[in-house]
């Protein structure tokens, strides 16, 4: 294999999750997304829903980011907020799952967790509004107003979480090795491109 790991960050409605799942299936490797949260939930004996609430509570402030990173480097977890502890637990879970072999990782700043590993390709998937609206409508069967609300909510959540924990912009294409427009390439087209990196 040319690369062992693919980390995928994606815009809500771009089909990124579906692309990751199909890629993993075709390459016969695991795809970790919600599983990362489940690992943390088991460790702390809390629900996945609670973890998601902690993620939503993350601020994108510079001071928060510096604080979390300094505590992580010193190994001092006592002063960390619940949000900071969850982030570090997710990073540890990703690193642990990577030890099992080749995999696709969805979101959760996986590229940051695996930055010291070789064979990692960082991917960002985006699409035009029309494509995203169509996919969201098909997946959720909701009104256009609700659809736009959800799209903005989830993209903002992902951007804040990424920024707060990496000090980088989630949608800055310079943070990725490959950027794919699923609206132009299609779901299968994106899978084909990524598969060529693995086999």
Segments predicted by a language model, with ranges:
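Small-molecule kinase domains that catalyze NTP-dependent phosphoryl transfer to phosphate-bearing small molecules
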Residues: 61-66, 143-188
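Short, amphipathic alpha-helical "lid/cap" segments that border enzyme active or binding sites
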Residues: 91, 187-195
């Amino acid at each position: 294999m040319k690369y062992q790991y693919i980390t995928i960050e994606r815009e809500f409605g771009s089909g990124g999750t579906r692309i990751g799942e199909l890629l993993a299936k075709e390459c016969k490797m695991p795809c970790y997304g919600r599983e990362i949260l489940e690992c943390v939930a088991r460790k702390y004996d809390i629900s996945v829903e609670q973890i998601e609430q902690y993620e939503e509570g993350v601020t994108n402030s510079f001071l928060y980011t510096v604080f979390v990173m300094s505590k992580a480097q010193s190994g001092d977890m006592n002063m960390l907020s619940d949000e900071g502890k969850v982030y570090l637990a997710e990073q540890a879970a990703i690193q642990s799952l990577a030890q099992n072999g080749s995999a696709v990782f969805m979101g959760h700043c996986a590229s940051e967790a695996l930055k010291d590993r070789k064979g990692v390709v960082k991917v960002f998937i985006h699409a035009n509004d029309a494509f995203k609206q169509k996919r969201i409508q098909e997946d959720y069967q909701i009104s256009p107003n609700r659809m736009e609300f959800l799209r903005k909510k989830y993209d903002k959540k992902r951007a804040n979480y990424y920024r707060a924990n990496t000090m980088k912009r989630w949608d800055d294409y310079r943070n990725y090795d490959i950027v794919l427009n699923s609206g132009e390439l299609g779901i299968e087209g994106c899978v084909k491109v990524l598969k060529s990196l693995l086999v």
